[in-house]
Structure formats: C-alpha cells, structure tokens
C-alpha cells in the first residue's frame, strides 16, 4: 500500500527560519548605522538606497528560490489555478505569496496585512516594522525618520514582479513617521 504524502497548507517553518537567519535585521541595522555615522541627510539617503536596495533584491530572490523549493498545498493549488486560467490570476496572487514568505520570515508576522488584491493591484501594509525600530534604536529616531529603509520594500516588490515577468508600477503610499504605517502597492501595467 502506498502511503499518501501529508498535505500542508502552512508555510514551511524551516524555510522561514533559514530566510530569517540569512537576512538578519539586527546585522542590517548595525551595518547601515556604521555606514551613515556622521553623514548628511543626502549621504544617508544615498547610502541607504545602496544598502537597503541590495538587501531587498537579495531577500526577494532568495525568498522566491526557497518558496519554490518548499511548496505548500496552497501554492500548488494557486499555480494550478493560474495555469488553468492562462495566467489571469498570476498578478497579484503569486506575488502575494512570496511577499508573505519574505515578511513572515524577517518580521515574524503571522499574516501580512493585504489591503487590496485584485487582477490589477496589490497593496499591503506594515504597521510594526522591526527594521525601522532597529534603525531608530541604533541610529536614532531622526535617521530612522528619513525612511532610507523604504528601499528594501520598494526594491523587493519591484524585483519580484520583474522576475515573475509581471509589468507593474511599484509605489510607497504611506510611511511610518507620517502615517503610522508603511503601505506599498504594485499596479499592473496594461
């Protein structure tokens, strides 16, 4: 008798732990704070863009790689639906899955707050950001409020859509210092 493979609808915890270990938030904050010590606002922005964009790019590419290596039943069904409908639901359902993996890993979120998911737009919100908190604690509140860390999320979302061959405009719609949360969106280009 052939034993059936157990189906899991949850993200693999080993995968999440591996990403969390490889993309340690405290190490990132330390590296950034050392690099910007004594620098002007413009220099902080430039250094932040370089450091954080690289982190976001590498995070998302590793997330997609591991997400494919550790599929769950939810993802398998999602891919079947996308294939069955000739890719119609690829935007924004597939990107959402990889964003959930990335944020669940580094932020240890149970759920990523999705504000909108439609065939034309994906928007999500971050209310409690450990990267922003680490920057405020290590570099000071004024440096954190410059929001150089936004380049992590903007780059991650942009790279994700590019690598999935989805044309999208990526925006930051809200920021923690101004709005009390960060919100990012990807809008499908027609």
Where on the chain are the PLM-derived regions?
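Conserved ATPase active-site switch/coordination loops adjacent to the nucleotide-binding site
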Residues: 164
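N-terminal accessory segment detector
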Residues: 1-151, 167-181, 189-190
């Amino acid at each position: 008798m052939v034993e059936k493979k157990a189906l899991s609808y949850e993200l693999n915890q080993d995968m999440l732990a591996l990403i969390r270990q490889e993309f340690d938030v405290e190490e990132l904050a330390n590296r950034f704070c050392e690099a910007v010590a004594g620098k002007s606002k413009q220099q902080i922005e430039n250094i932040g863009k370089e450091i954080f964009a690289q982190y976001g790019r590498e995070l998302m590419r590793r997330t997609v790689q591991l997400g494919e290596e550790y599929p769950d039943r939810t993802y398998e069904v999602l891919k079947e639906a996308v294939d069955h409908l000739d890719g119609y639901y690829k935007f924004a359902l597939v990107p959402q899955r990889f964003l959930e993996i990335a944020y669940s890993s580094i932020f240890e979120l149970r759920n990523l707050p999705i504000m909108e998911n439609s065939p034309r737009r994906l928007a999500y919100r971050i209310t409690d950001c450990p990267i922003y908190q680490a920057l405020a604690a290590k570099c000071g509140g004024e440096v954190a409020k410059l929001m150089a860390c936004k380049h992590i999320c903007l780059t991650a979302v942009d790279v994700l859509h590019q690598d999935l061959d989805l044309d999208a405009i990526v925006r930051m719609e809200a920021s923690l210092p101004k709005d009390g949360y960060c919100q990012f969106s990807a809008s499908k280009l027609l």
